[in-house]
Design a protein with these regions (language model features):
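Structural alpha/beta surface segment adjacent to cysteine/selenocysteine redox centers
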Residues: 49, 54-143, 148, 173-178, ...
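Membrane-interface motif at the C-terminal end of an N-terminal transmembrane signal
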Residues: 22-35
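Short clusters of hydrophobic/aromatic residues that line enzyme substrate/ligand-binding pockets
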Residues: 42-44, 128, 190
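Short, flexible loop segments at the rims of nucleotide/cofactor-binding pockets, characterized by
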Residues: 31-33, 62, 160-161
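Short gly/ser/thr-rich secondary-structure transition/capping motifs
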Residues: 33-39, 163-166
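A short beta-strand-turn-helix
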Residues: 35-51, 76
Length: 220
């Protein structure tokens, strides 16, 4: 049986742990500053859309590839009703080339071909995702899209490119992202393609409430 003195000590110790945890989280948030929007080439839809989707994704993740197709379909069905921001969360411990893939995709974006390069990364995961040496596919994809490979190499190695990705990873950590893809749909978490589709079933109601607009069911 715990006596009163022991109970007080336990409560005090627990309180100190709580305060310390909050202090660490606040310090991390302060060091990150305000959450940064994704760059324009990873942002789709109007700023005032009723449905706001933020995705944390990894190009070497099979579930992320499946989700990319679902997102594309949702954008086609709901159009300007959705604002989508794509953010990087490469799981570098299990996908050694995913950070490089994210960097090259961003650099393709700076040359106007983010979506096309991202699609090639997803479609060819089995060719580069678990390569033992730096994948040649990164250059091959650039060549197929007529991108300037030297410029992409310089861009990929630039501190600003890597820092942007790592800041997004840190933001994901702050939101307790621990799997990909993780979505925040109007602030509500969804993990994986199945939960994305589950949340998408509510989109008609959200749009109707926002604009009195009815959209035929997507069927996904």
């Amino acid at each position: 049986m715990i006596n009163r003195k022991t109970a007080r000590l336990i409560a005090l110790y627990g309180g100190l742990i709580f305060v310390s945890t909050v202090a660490v989280l606040l310090a991390r948030q302060f060091s990150l500053g305000p959450e940064r929007p994704a760059p324009n080439f990873r942002t789709f839809g109007p700023a005032g859309a009723p449905i706001m989707i933020e995705e944390y994704s990894d190009f070497a993740c099979g579930a992320c590839r499946a989700a990319a197709g679902k997102l594309e379909e949702l954008l086609k069905v709901y159009g300007d009703g959705i604002r989508l921001q794509l953010k990087h969360y490469p799981l570098v411990n299990i996908h050694p080339w995913s950070l490089d893939a994210a960097a090259y995709a961003d650099c393709a974006g700076e040359q106007g071909k983010y979506k096309e390069y991202a699609a090639l990364l997803f479609e060819n995961q089995d060719k580069w995702g678990e390569a033992k040496e730096k994948p040649k596919e990164f250059e091959a994809f650039a060549g197929g899209l007529k991108l300037d490979w030297k410029e992409m190499q310089a861009c990929s190695a630039a501190p600003r490119t890597r820092q942007r990705i790592k800041l997004e990873m840190a933001e994901g950590d702050m939101k307790n992202v621990n799997a990909t893809p993780t979505f925040f749909i109007n602030g509500k978490r969804a993990v994986g393609p199945a939960q994305l589709v589950e949340q998408a079933r509510k989109f008609d109601g959200i749009l109707k409430a926002a604009h009195g607009r009815h959209v035929p069911p997507s069927g996904i």
